[in-house]
């Protein structure tokens, strides 16, 4: 433990006012009067509680307190104000890493060593009750990296640094079990502290387990100093909250930002090289906590960005926020998400030119902009439609994809199908949880791929819905699936009993009911997916263009009614037409086969050439020529045809079929027997050479 505490990464600099607050806290907790000690003496009371809490199995044993006698000058006015306005809070074991430690930790975990990452950054912020139950709001900086983050360190002293969610690290999966244990230990510690609260923390009740999960979830992203912006936003609102203490869950992030308000630029430059000396298991337990907001299923869905806009208006004009943003280069779009990981809006990164006195007006600075189009999801976390303006456009895919198959207990749950809370870059955030996900794609691009690979129950065929135990006996879009299945089975039996083929039925329907009910609509699977999610005008244009191109309009309909390869709505539409036609066909059949033939029409005769039969002698000659040359010339094929007394076209087709059969054989052997594929390679080469 002593070696760990001597690490420069952990024993860093801290402002004197904050140290004095910590010293007063420790003096009250330990029953000792050491509030007026020097900076060098303050290190002992800060470190003592950490060692004493090791027996409680808390995450504090992995982190040391920060203190350094090098900072002896009084703090800046902002630091004085922070120490004066914020009442004392327990300092003991805080499961946080500072910005410097996070940056070096990422460099130590990621392959390659140097911090050359370019991954989205999630910055959590809570706005003192103005978000209406939105815990765990996260600010995402998709284009940030460790290079353009270094300029933000200077703003850390003024605005403070909050915790970051270092998701998408390779160490996440390997440390998952340790992180779960740390979470459990933290909850146990909180319960113990609630049972025995210190006398000086009466105004700061312990937060619910949800708040620590936020603080642990957020220390996980490679660009720590991006946190100054939200951290500087927080001090105005949480200050009054600490005095009133109406929402304990929002105290914890503020105390974390106070903790990380300590690092200075000199500390940033000196500490990163020391971090890799710690193993990932010891250096990143709390930062690498899995994305807990995905597990918080009790909070309501944030489908409106107005709440976030109201919250941001109170802190948009923060001078520290503007100073921090002025140092960002290459960071443009940001995303505001709630505790469920759902995007509720965007924030443009623009420094505020106005002074901090204009904070009350909220007219300048940052504004949350709602994202459109938005994605409509169901309770299983599947995207079922996109919302553009007032239109809901279903997303079609017969397979269906669950958006967040992360780990057990980490799947994203959506409250209802009617709530719209995800924006165009939902796929980007969801992919953050995958340790092997690539962040090179833009959020909109991710969303388009996610939406194109998602499905809704209305787009699935009847056969797929019937095979699903959850929907087999139910109704989809008001259509009884069991009734459709029974009708399709009976229709096929009735058709066969009349001696009719599917082609005949299609021709008859096309003649009597129109081309939309041709064989293509009943028997064959040919569909234009755009028919489902294009606007009505686009559908009409598509149909008109298909008619102009002499294409069957029935191709626009889902098909294969008899095999249930058709959507419920289309099946419900075509069912009465088939029933009416079949009843008339059966009536004509009872009146006489001639009447049925007149009703259906004769099937067009197809002239087919007689299949050629090769004699064994002819096959022997053909195989001998094929072994010599698989691609004979036209003159050679003519000579072979004259020699065998066959048509030249017959010989040409035989060589084509023989070559294709050889390719299929080689391909099949390579797939099923890799060991035997090696001797066949010279054969293939020789064949190609001869050709």
UniProtKB/Swiss-Prot annotation:
Q: Where is the composition biased (Pro residues)?
A: 196-210, 221-238
Pfam families documented for this protein: Homeodomain, Pou
DNA-binding positions? 607-666
* Compartments, record wording: Nucleus
Give tissue specificity per the record: Expressed only within the CNS, where its expression is restricted to the medical habenulla, to a dispersed population of neurons in the dorsal hypothalamus, and to subsets of ganglion and amacrine cells in the retina.
GO MF terms held by the record: DNA-binding transcription factor activity; DNA-binding transcription factor activity, RNA polymerase II-specific; RNA polymerase II cis-regulatory region sequence-specific DNA binding
Where composition is biased (Basic and acidic residues), the residues are 25-36
Report the protein name in the record. Answer: POU domain, class 6, transcription factor 2
């Amino acid at each position: 433990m002593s070696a760990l505490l001597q690490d420069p990464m952990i024993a860093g600099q801290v402002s004197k006012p904050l140290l004095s607050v910590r010293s007063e806290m420790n003096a009250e907790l330990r029953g000792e009067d050491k509030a007026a000690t020097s900076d060098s003496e303050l290190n002992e009371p800060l470190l003592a509680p950490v060692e004493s809490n090791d027996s409680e199995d808390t995450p504090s044993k992995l982190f040391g307190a920060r203190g350094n006698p090098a900072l002896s000058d009084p703090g800046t006015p902002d630091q004085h104000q922070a120490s004066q306005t914020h009442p004392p809070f327990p300092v003991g074991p805080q499961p946080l890493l500072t910005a410097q430690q996070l940056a070096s930790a990422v460099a130590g975990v990621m392959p390659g060593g140097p911090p050359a990452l370019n991954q989205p950054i999630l910055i959590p912020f809570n706005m003192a009750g103005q978000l209406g139950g939105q815990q765990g709001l996260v600010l995402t900086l998709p284009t940030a990296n460790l290079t353009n983050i270094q300029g933000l360190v200077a703003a850390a002293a003024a605005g403070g640094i909050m915790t970051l969610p270092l998701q998408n690290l390779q160490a996440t999966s390997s440390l998952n079990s340790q992180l779960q244990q740390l979470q459990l230990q933290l909850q146990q510690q909180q319960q113990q502290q609630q049972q025995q609260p210190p006398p000086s923390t009466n105004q700061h009740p312990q937060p619910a387990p949800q708040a620590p999960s936020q603080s642990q979830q957020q220390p996980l992203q490679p660009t720590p100093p991006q946190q100054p912006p939200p951290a500087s936003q927080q001090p105005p609102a949480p200050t009054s909250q600490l005095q009133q203490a109406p929402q304990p869950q929002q105290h914890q992030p503020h105390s974390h930002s106070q903790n990380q308000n300590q690092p200075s630029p000199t500390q940033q430059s000196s500490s990163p090289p020391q971090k890799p000396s710690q193993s990932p298991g010891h250096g990143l337990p709390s930062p690498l906590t899995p994305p807990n907001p995905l597990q918080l299923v009790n909070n309501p869905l944030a489908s409106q960005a107005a709440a976030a806009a109201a919250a941001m208006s109170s802190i948009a004009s923060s001078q520290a926020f503007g100073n921090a943003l002025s140092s960002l280069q290459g960071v443009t779009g940001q995303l505001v998400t709630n505790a469920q990981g759902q995007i509720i809006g965007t924030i443009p990164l623009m420094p505020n030119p106005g002074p901090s006195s204009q904070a009350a007006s909220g007219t300048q600075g940052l504004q949350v902009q709602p994202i459109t189009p938005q994605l409509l999801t169901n309770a299983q976390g599947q995207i079922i439609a996109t919302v553009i303006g007032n239109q809901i456009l279903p997303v079609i895919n017969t397979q269906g994809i669950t958006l967040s198959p992360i780990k057990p207990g980490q799947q994203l749950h959506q409250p209802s199908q009617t709530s719209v809370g995800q924006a165009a870059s939902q796929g980007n955030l969801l992919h953050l949880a995958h340790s092997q996900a690539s962040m090179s794609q833009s959020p909109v691009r991710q969303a388009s791929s996610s939406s194109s690979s998602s499905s809704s129950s209305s787009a699935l065929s009847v056969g797929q819905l019937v095979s699903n135990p959850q929907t087999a006996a139910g109704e989809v879009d008001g259509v009884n699936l069991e009734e459709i299945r029974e009708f399709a089975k009976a229709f096929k039996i009735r058709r066969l009993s009349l001696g009719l083929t599917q082609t005949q039925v299609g021709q008859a329907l096309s003649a009597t009911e129109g081309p939309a009910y041709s064989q293509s609509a009943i028997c064959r699977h040919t569909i234009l997916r755009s028919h489902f999610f294009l606007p009505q005008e686009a559908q009409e244009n598509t149909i008109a263009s298909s008619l102009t191109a002499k294409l069957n309009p029935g191709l626009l309909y889902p098909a294969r009614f008899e095999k249930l390869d058709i959507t419920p709505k289309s099946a419900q539409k075509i069912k009465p037409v088939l029933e009416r036609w079949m009843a008339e066909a059966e009536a004509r059949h009872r009146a006489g086969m001639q009447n049925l033939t007149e009703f259906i029409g004769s099937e067009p005769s197809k002239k087919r050439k007689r299949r050629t039969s090769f004699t064994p002698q002819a096959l022997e000659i053909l195989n001998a020529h094929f072994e010599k040359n698989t691609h004979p010339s036209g003159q050679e094929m003519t000579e072979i045809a004259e020699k065998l007394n066959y048509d030249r076209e017959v010989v040409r087709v035989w060589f084509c079929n023989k070559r294709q059969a050889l390719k299929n054989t080689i391909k099949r052997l390579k797939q099923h027997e890799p060991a035997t594929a090696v001797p066949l390679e010279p054969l293939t080469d020789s064949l190609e050479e001869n050709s």
